[in-house]
């Protein structure tokens, strides 16, 4: 599908005039849609932006969304084991629930239930590109966009057919196929499907998370299907419809319920999404209207009794979204505005909502964004008001200014507010819910420089984020939630990219001081320092790559040891680690490419969640056929 945010050639020409010269003069000024909900060149966006293409995903030979995101600036990924195990994404030191995860511009369903998005359940075979914006974006998108926005796009961008087959360590095997074909001059049909299975490994071998030791393999299986059709009615109107879904089964290590003789260590997730829309594009004006529906069923159960058996747990959620957006070119910039409506609902039969008085909430948001250029200065501003069916109106705003003070060098500064709405669980569940909760709020300052020095294109950013009204539960029964927490996060980020001879270098460094605003303790599972480096080069027809990732020291809790002195679980420290991956690819023919990868080359033993192992050294071999 073409983007519902599409602009005309005239519109893109205006934004090209606004583009930062250091970036605009390159051959890779990519077009994105996620920063302000319309198409614009990356170089015209004042916030730090990273775009990951399908070609890069294939080059890195990643096998999960988590593996892709861990390479990006400002991202920490904590995962309770290997592929398919529960994962959390931290951006710029904010909590996982403060990162907005979108799939094709629509908020991931489960975020409205648990508060954060578990990216381990999204099949990478569906992902065609990822747009990642750092900093506050609630003034554009509403709730969740505190630390940043990650938009996962599933649309195949080229005609043709691709077949892939991969085998690897721990019994890993994956098969996927995708095709895009034209029917006549105005209709395009796209289809994709995949199957993934891995035996996995014992993610909790030491039994030191408070549960019963389970010496077993914790495997994962995924099946996914994607179908879409787009039709160009005339030169101005496009319509599209699509449907996609996936089924996942995950084995994990769990706590034993001795009273009921239940060990619920298997997760089965079903997700179905249907959406459609229409877009209009003429001259300086464009508009879109779309509707999306998602139903997700998430079971946790003891395989001895079956998915619907004794003491099984079900989270059954429904999400609907309607979006209407408009964009018009004005002077040396543009103005955009729109309305979106969403409903999140917990369906009958869900385990944690048996005593709830209410099982849904609605949210309506109205937003306005603008960007203008005046010589070497670009200014942008956004404002948005959200009406929540429970707590009423909440307004956020942000502004950024960039000044190109010398050819190829720009200084940027900005301020923004953001918020996170209470989730369905926090408001209405049978345990600890509080219908009087207010949104968590954030105030953020950011400043930096970017430029091009010789072959190096770089950006240096410093930021501060004060978060208040954090929702926390009582430490004793009835464990009710209240707005009592605070956090202060300060950080510095440097990113760079350059070519030398046959080598292409991409690297980032981040320093984060993320602390509890009241106790001043460091926030858990966030590394103080990270260094990420990607080296790619070609020799003859070989395409070679080296990935280096240094993850600094982090804190966590030992949930197997309760310390009465602090009335909580024992704090622990996890040391830093250096990780290397190597990749190679060779085109056997014009259609067939063979790829190989060694992950964690030096077989480092480390954890991103205390008590849960990582995979160790792994080997993968892929065959890819295009026609």
Question: How should these model regions be labeled?
Answer:
Residues 66, 70-106, 110:
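Extracytoplasmic beta-strand/coil segments of soluble accessory domains associated
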Residues 107-134:
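Short acidic/polar hinge/loop motifs at secondary-structure boundaries
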Residues 27-60, 88:
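N-terminal periplasmic "start-of-domain" segments of outer-membrane beta-barrel proteins
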Residues 57, 69, 130-131, 150-152, ...:
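Non-catalytic regulatory/gating segments with a bias toward low-complexity or hydrophobic composition
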